[in-house]
Amino acid sequence: MKPGIHPEYAVITANCTCGNVIKVNSTAGKDLHLDVCGACHPFYTGTQKVVDTGGRIDKFNKRFGMLGKK
């Protein structure tokens, strides 16, 4: 490898909304804020998280629902 062309790695902390703190190496050099991590992601925990998108679906059906019917 050529000397002097590679970025420097710094240890940063990635803070999750669940409170989990992860130390990682990064070239960005700033701390990160995560929405989900391995400790709280539904795939890894085995729990379902309900996302309320009913308002969007109702709004879409109200606008375009009659177009598909004959």
Curated annotation (Swiss-Prot):
Gene Ontology MF term list: metal ion binding; rRNA binding; structural constituent of ribosome
TM stretches of this protein: none
Domain of life: Bacteria
Cofactor-binding details, from the entry: Binds 1 zinc ion per subunit.
Alphabetic keyword roster: Metal-binding, Ribonucleoprotein, Ribosomal protein, RNA-binding, rRNA-binding, Zinc
GO biological process, one term: translation
Keyword Ribosomal protein: yes
Gene3D superfamilies per record: Ribosomal protein L31
Known function: Binds the 23S rRNA.
Quaternary structure and partners: Part of the 50S ribosomal subunit.
PANTHER family recorded: 50S RIBOSOMAL PROTEIN L31, CHLOROPLASTIC, LARGE RIBOSOMAL SUBUNIT PROTEIN BL31A
Name this protein carries in UniProt: Large ribosomal subunit protein bL31
Originating gene: rpmE
